[in-house]
């Protein structure tokens, strides 16, 4: 399935069976291909044959195009090259600036401190603290990661 077919997965419920609108998904696929610089010969190229970074761009672009009020990502850049990682980070930051609640699950403290407003820290499957990313540091977050109830967490 190419990018256009992949875009149609999100609009299938809105369609009318065999009379599904194919122009909107094609236009969206073209826009994502160009704006996110997806490296593929065409929007009909099978997504499953693309590199991991390009697949990630297609999926994140498709979800953002739905104009969600909440966008949740888990390890959004795991295994991606640095350029693609920054593309994804920039997309998430743009969404945050538009008022979308972005829930970012990750483990790179530098990235979390840069991207997030608040950080919910887990330890042993339990919340050990909630900190303001603008006023905390890696040492405080690290302390919260190692023991439940420890550290001087500010409830944000």
Feature-to-residue mapping (PLM):
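Glycine-rich phosphate-binding loops of nucleotide-dependent enzymes
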Residues: 1-156
């Amino acid at each position: 399935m190419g990018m256009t077919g992949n875009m149609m997965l999100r609009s299938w419920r809105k369609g009318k069976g065999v009379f599904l609108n194919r122009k909107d998904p094609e236009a969206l696929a073209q826009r994502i291909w160009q704006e996110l610089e997806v490296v593929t010969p065409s929007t009909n190229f099978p997504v499953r044959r693309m590199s991991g970074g390009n697949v990630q761009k297609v999926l994140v672009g498709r979800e953002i195009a739905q104009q969600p009020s909440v966008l949740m990502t888990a390890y959004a850049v795991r295994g991606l090259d640095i350029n693609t990682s920054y593309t994804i980070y920039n997309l998430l930051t743009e969404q945050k600036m538009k008022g979308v609640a972005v829930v970012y699950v990750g483990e790179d403290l530098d990235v979390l401190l840069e991207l997030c407003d608040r950080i919910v820290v887990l330890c042993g499957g339990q919340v050990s603290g909630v900190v303001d990313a603008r006023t905390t540091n890696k040492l405080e977050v690290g302390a919260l990661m190692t023991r439940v109830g420890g550290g001087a967490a500010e409830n944000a």
